Amino acid sequence: MRRTRTRTRHGVGHLSTIAQSHSWTVMEDHKEITQQLEGDLCLPGDRLRSCKSPIIEFYEEILSLAFGLTCQSVSPQMWQLLGVLYEVFQHDCFDYFTDMMPLLHNYVTVDTDMLLSNPKHLEVIYSMCKKVLTIDAGEDAECHAAKLLEVIILQCRGRGIDQCIPLFVEVVLERLMRGVKSSELRTMCLQVAIAALYYNPALLIHTLDNMHFQHNPQPITAHFINQWMNDTEFFLG
């Protein structure tokens, strides 16, 4: 076991060196190099399933390399890595969520067709965002989670994710109702609902009309509109 861990540490250290020293543009022209890197990445990535593993020390390097490998396309091997990341996240490693964000963004925007072809992909990403917005993960991570939900809505407009809109809107407005200190997080939560308005106005209104939160007698629709108007100055675009 100790020998295996040592090999893994050395392997990921080597991958980190590659990530820092190689040009992604050059590697894109040599598919065999990219395929080899993806295979090498998935081997230590598999050992990330246990947060007790010393490989967690290299988590940021693994995420950085995976991001670079998914900027132009997302291979089947890289889609498998999403499941591994989710398992790691479930083991109280959500402190790394902000480091995951660039890679998760690639999953959504670079290969939207594959994202939507398997409901599990979207479910995994939503579950991660929901956990960050539900627990005390800190407003920086919460901003990233809300932003990712907004990106999904905008990226998938007209792609049949109607069933996701109520889930996305509810989780951000519930977070908003708990009180938000920073204008940035408040704005990001509102932007998810605004993206839903752009996606399908009737669906958003129906969603808001059917939402009810404890300890808040004010109609959700009115609260959303009032908060939006009050924070207009914070919207940068």
What are these regions (language model features)?
Residues 1-3, 7-237:
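Karyopherin-beta/Importin-beta family HEAT-repeat alpha-solenoid scaffold
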